[in-house]
C-alpha cells in the first residue's frame, strides 16, 4: 500500500461526515436558497466519494465514469439553480425562502 492510498474505512468516514454536514445544513438553514444549493452539492460530493472509494476497492473504472456523469449533471443543476436564484433576487430583492412562499407574478 503506497502512501497516497486511502483505506476504505477512512474514506467512508469522510464521506459520511460530508453527507451529515450537508443534511445538517439543509435542516438548520431552510431559509437561504444559496445554502440549500451548496448543501445539495455537498451531498453529491459525498456520493461521488463513495463511488470512487468502492470503485477503487473493487478495481473497477465504472465508479470514475459514474462520478464524471454525476459531476456533469451537478454542474448543470448548479447553473440552473443559480440562474433561478438571480432571477428571483432581481424580481423580489430577496432570497429568503420565508418571504418567497407566495406564487405572485
From Swiss-Prot:
GO biological process: ATP synthesis coupled electron transport
Membrane-spanning segments: 8-28, 33-53, 65-85
EC numbers, comma separated: 7.1.1.-
Gene3D superfamilies in the cross-refs: 1.10.287.3510
Pfam families xref list: Oxidored_q2 (PF00420)
GO CC annotations, alphabetized: NADH dehydrogenase complex; plasma membrane
Lipid bilayer topology: Multi-pass membrane protein
Catalytic activity: a quinone + NADH + 5 H(+)(in) = a quinol + NAD(+) + 4 H(+)(out)
Top-level division of the source organism's lineage: Bacteria
InterPro entries: NADH_UbQ_OxRdtase_chain4L/K (IPR001133), NUOK/Mnh_C1-like (IPR039428)
UniProt keyword terms in alphabetical order: Cell inner membrane, Cell membrane, Membrane, NAD, Quinone, Translocase, Transmembrane, Transmembrane helix, Transport, Ubiquinone
Enzyme class, broadest EC rank: translocase
One GO MF term: quinone binding
Compartments where located: Cell inner membrane
Subunit details: NDH-1 is composed of 14 different subunits. Subunits NuoA, H, J, K, L, M, N constitute the membrane sector of the complex.
Family in the record: Belongs to the complex I subunit 4L family.
NCBIfam families found in the cross-reference section: PRK05715.1-2, PRK05715.1-3, PRK05715.1-5
Biological function: NDH-1 shuttles electrons from NADH, via FMN and iron-sulfur (Fe-S) centers, to quinones in the respiratory chain. The immediate electron acceptor for the enzyme in this species is believed to be ubiquinone. Couples the redox reaction to proton translocation (for every two electrons transferred, four hydrogen ions are translocated across the cytoplasmic membrane), and thus conserves the redox energy in a proton gradient.
Name of the protein in question: NADH-quinone oxidoreductase subunit K
Organism: Francisella philomiragia subsp. philomiragia (strain ATCC 25017 / CCUG 19701 / FSC 153 / O#319-036)
Amino acid at each position: 500500500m503506497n502512501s497516497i492510498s486511502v483505506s476504505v474505512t477512512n474514506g467512508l468516514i469522510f464521506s459520511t461526515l460530508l453527507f451529515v454536514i450537508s443534511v445538517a445544513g439543509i435542516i438548520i438553514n431552510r431559509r437561504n436558497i444559496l445554502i440549500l444549493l451548496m448543501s445539495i452539492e455537498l451531498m453529491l460530493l459525498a456520493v461521488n466519494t463513495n463511488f470512487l472509494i468502492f470503485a477503487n476497492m473493487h478495481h473497477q473504472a465504472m465508479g470514475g465514469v459514474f462520478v464524471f456523469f454525476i459531476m456533469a449533471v451537478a454542474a448543470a443543476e448548479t447553473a440552473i439553480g443559480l440562474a433561478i436564484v438571480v432571477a428571483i433576487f432581481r424580481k423580489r430583492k430577496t432570497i429568503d425562502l420565508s418571504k418567497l412562499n407566495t406564487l405572485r407574478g
